[in-house]
Amino acid sequence: MPSPFDPHGGRVLMLEPPGASAEALRSQLLDETYAKPYVMDDGERRFLHFNGRLIQSAMRLAEPNDLDLRYTQKMMSFLLFRSRPRRLLLIGLGGGSLVKFCHYRLPATHMTVLENNPDVIALRDAFLVPPDGPNLKVQEADGAEYLEQTEKGIDVLLVDAFDSTGFAPSLANREFFEQARSKLTGSGMLVVNLAGDAQTYAGLIGVVMQVFDDQVIMFPVREDHNYVLLAFRDPIFEPNWRRLRDLAKELRSKYGLDFPAFLEKIERSAKLGLARHEAGRRY
């Protein structure tokens, strides 16, 4: 149906039967009572929405396998520390931006993607998420429950899990992060996208720092008003910034992302103790 938000055109893709009332659906979109995720398409980009205020995911139609939103690019900064992950777990499918980038750029990595909303999974074709195969599995599951049952040995755990109210409630607790740490390899790491109202995630920063023995770096994504949090399983992890600067240049050439700029923010945030500062803030 035509987009009710964009006066210059565009359309909305919804998970509704052909006979559904377009006028009723339009009204639900505008007053934010529509309960399912939906897709906005302006002819150049495609967006996943849970409501009209926040973009959950974005895809450029001309480059569907690239990372459009800055926070997704910066979540790939884990490659600075784990450049050849064998096993990657992603909680939160969204529009599949991270799935596609990792699937096509890291062909030797086995990736499992967890999404607890079947309506989000039903939209995977709209975002050109590749079908499941030997190195990719998209599974309808709760991230916390899956971690309880899965085997140890995760190299990188990416968490980009949100609902219409903010960070996924089932993951916003100490038990989840303790379980996450226990399932990582000795040199494994956790990467979390923190977005939305800071009050909804501020307490989690301190929890993660406690669980991961203060081996946490948090850095801003000012373009998207997000933070990316990196937590390291190794209790004596110490970044070699000089070596990482050389690696960042190699990764930029290989993947086309600005890893030197990412590293500069990561190093600055680590030396300023941004994670500890944010954990101590009162909102």
Identify the residue ranges that each predicted region occupies.
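SAM/dcSAM-binding transferase cores
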Residues: 2-43, 47, 55-62, 227-283
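Short glycine-/acidic-enriched loop or helix-start segments at secondary-structure transitions
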Residues: 99-100, 168, 201-202, 240-241
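A short, flexible beta-alpha/helix-coil linker loop
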Residues: 53-57, 162-165, 190
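The AdoMet/dcAdoMet-binding core of the Class I SAM-like
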Residues: 3-4, 11, 28-30, 42, ...
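A generic structural signal for alpha->beta connector loops
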Residues: 108-110, 133-135, 187, 213-215, ...
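C-terminal substrate-binding/active-site "lid" region of AdoMet-derived donor-dependent transferases
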Residues: 175-239
